[in-house]
Amino acid sequence: MALPCKTGAAFKKYLLLLAQENCEFRLPEIKSLLSLYGGHFNNLQDEHGKSPFCILNLPSEEMARKLMKRTVCAKSVFELWGHGKTFMEFQQSVLSYPLENMMSYLQPNSTYKIIIHSFNKTLTQKEKLEKINTMEFIPFQGKVNLQNAENIFYLLEDYGSDPNKAPNEPFEIFFGRWIADGQRELINSYSVKKRHFIGNTSMDAGLSFIMANHARVKPNDVVFDPFVGTGGLLVSSAHFGAYVCGTEIDYNTVHGLGKATRMNQKWRGPDENIRANLRQYGLEKYYLDVLVSDASKPVWRKAPLFDAIITDPPYGIRESTRKTGTQKEIIKTELFPESHVPVQLNYHLSDIFSDLFAFASEFLVTGGRLVYWLPVYRPEYTEEVLPRHPCLKLISNCEQMLSSHTSRRLITMEKVKEFEEKYQYAHLGEGQNLPYKGHNSFREKYFSGLKKRTAREERARSEMANAENVKSKGKEDV
């Protein structure tokens, strides 16, 4: 069920209790955070991928606590004292745990309590007490204190992935000392529902923090979003102490003008902007700036400026894909007005990703990460369609379902080579981004599936109505 990593002589086993949402994102987040703190996670949990239990080998409890101060995908971490697929195997595992590692938590002058956690099965209070009583083989000498215990122990049981088919006995049993909880409360405290400035496509708070963790954002980093929108991705990075900036082609969005997104509010208020969002959370000191600028035409000095690039490019579904330009050549004269507003053209998804990769290869520091969303039409998806660049290495690829036929993938890339002029056009390689060629290519596929589903539903309703008519007519004839 839980899959351990490779063992080491100086390492202890720790048990992670993972959240049961965004399952594909969990282990890549843990792996990224461990690499940030100098740890390693060598084996991924391929078997039973939805299990909330994951065994890690860590060099110290301090690293486990650091991990919990960042992760939003893990609920808790425990020092693992034993585990097994049967009670006898479990008991033997706990008894073989070094006694010297236990004794400081079993002293007569200490207090403790044991909590039962069952995955996908509800236990009665009587059943929980019976399970606690089975732990008498551990030499607890302290006093039980259910309100304010010094040491908290957990007995965790895995009853499989289907709550409707839970067996009588668990597939696996774990016992350990609770160390720390993760940062799941950030999802609620930074909820978009409570945010001052939002838009139609503001990123979910939980996914924003996952992206920041995949990017290994740390204090004093400079994080950039070339398609910043309402700045949801900047908020999570600023929470972790990074300085944030971005660009956005829509003047009204950057300056908080125009129609409001919220129900019962017609126009945006005078203080609705990205800076106000950071101010709301006490993070304004990390705000560098957001420019009205075209992501396809970088305005930056040619140098590695950013420690991470975190972005959600427009797909053409609820936000249009645009860039500045014109179909015809315009000769600028001395009389050319300074206040001229450039014409905006369609910006193909294939060009968006090509430009994004070219930008990241040049402006990311070596070792910096690019984290972005890639929309996917599932019947056509293979790993070969992923954009590539010789300066960037694929770290993780996680899927979030949007509908039966579409999804989006959170792609994490790391810059492993210094940019050279010979890489300037590497992103234009033959065959790259073919599924994204043409304006609104993903939008057309997205809505083609929607139309088919709507047509099926209409046919079903029509057939049902016809059946009812035939039935009522038969009754009249009788």
Swiss-Prot record:
E.C. no: 2.1.1.214
UniProt-listed Gene3D superfamilies: Vaccinia Virus protein VP39
GO biological process: methylation; tRNA processing
Domain of life: Eukaryota
The reaction(s) this protein catalyses: guanosine(10) in tRNA + S-adenosyl-L-methionine = N(2)-methylguanosine(10) in tRNA + S-adenosyl-L-homocysteine + H(+)
Record's keyword annotation contains DNA-binding: no
InterPro entries cross-referenced by the UniProt entry: DNA_methylase_N6_adenine_CS, RlmKL-like_Mtase, SAM-dependent_MTases_sf, tRNA_mtfrase_TRM11
Function of the molecule: Catalytic subunit of the TRMT11-TRM112 methyltransferase complex, that specifically mediates the S-adenosyl-L-methionine-dependent N(2)-methylation of guanosine nucleotide at position 10 (m2G10) in tRNAs. This is one of the major tRNA (guanine-N(2))-methyltransferases.
Family indicated by similarity: Belongs to the class I-like SAM-binding methyltransferase superfamily. TRM11 methyltransferase family.
Record's subunit section: Part of the heterodimeric TRMT11-TRM112 methyltransferase complex; this complex forms an active tRNA methyltransferase, where TRMT112 acts as an activator of the catalytic subunit TRMT11.
PANTHER family: RNA METHYLASE-RELATED, TRNA (GUANINE(10)-N2)-METHYLTRANSFERASE HOMOLOG
Protein name per the record: tRNA (guanine(10)-N(2))-methyltransferase TRMT11
